[in-house]
Amino acid sequence: MAVPPSIDETKLEAFLGQMVGDLGAAANAPLMLLGDRLGLYRALAEAGPLTSRALAERAGAAERFVREWLAAQAAAGYITYDAAADTYAMPPEQALVLADEDSPVFLGGLFESLYAM
């Protein structure tokens, strides 16, 4: 299909950027649900920087799964990764939204609502 000459390239690029962002968010949604259900966000927020093995032990989850989950969450900017120490951490701002159920900005329950849809 040929692109009509009346296409606004700036609008097209903006829409493509929006679509890529939406697809990334959709791909991360199941991981957010798992992080909430398994207590991974909470454990990471409470303990401070942890290796994947240490977080897996705290959460009672398989280390391989936790390692993959951590890598995806770091890539999405939900947590941070310190390559020198090979540890992951949750910044306090993210902890308020993802781990602190008493926070007025906690969105953990939203993951369950999205899953139910």
Where are these regions (language model features)?
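N-terminal accessory segments
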Residues: 1-117
